């Protein structure tokens, strides 16, 4: 059962999008020339587009398109609600909270099915689900 979410942090959506991109791209993609005019400094990520939508249940959904250039052994992730490069083992083993995806003062909990994490502070809960 999915929890209602509100005020999703931009970084939470970034991770989901980056991971979906990472898992669907061929391993040789890093050897191909860049197809976009956006150049990103190695070891960093940059937001190149942002989207926001609300549905009938007053749940705000946010997503971002991010371009990352991670170092060897790193993949796109989220740190302090912002896109970042994180150790690949965190993502492979689904230890989401080890990349510190929540803002300071928020509590991170891995979802029971390991499909993502939630960040909570008071009565506010932001849930991020990673999809392939």
Curated annotation (Swiss-Prot):
What superkingdom heads the lineage?
A: Eukaryota
Check the UniProt entry and state the signal peptide residues, or none.
1-29
**BP GO annotations:** negative regulation of microglial cell activation; positive regulation of microglial cell activation
| Induction comment from the UniProt entry of this chain | By ischemia. Up-regulated in the microglia in the middle cerebral artery occlusion (MCAO), expression reduced back to control level at 14 days after MCAO.
One Gene Ontology cellular component? extracellular space
Q: Which UniProt keywords apply?
A: Secreted, Signal
Chief localisation class: secreted
Looking up InterPro entries in the UniProt record yields: Chemokine-like_TAFA, TAFA_chemokine-like
What is the annotated localization of this protein? Secreted
Tell me which tissues or organs this protein is expressed in: Highly expressed in brain, in regions such as the hippocampus, the habenular, thalamic nuclei and hypophysial pars tuberalis. Expression levels in the hypophysial pars tuberalis vary between day and night: they are low at mid-day and high at mid-night. The expression in the other regions do not display a day/night difference.
As for what it does, the entry says: Plays a role in the regulation of microglia polarization.
Q: Which family does it belong to?
A: Belongs to the TAFA family.
Give the protein name, as stated in the record.
Chemokine-like protein TAFA-3
Q: Which organism is it from?
A: Mus musculus (Mouse)
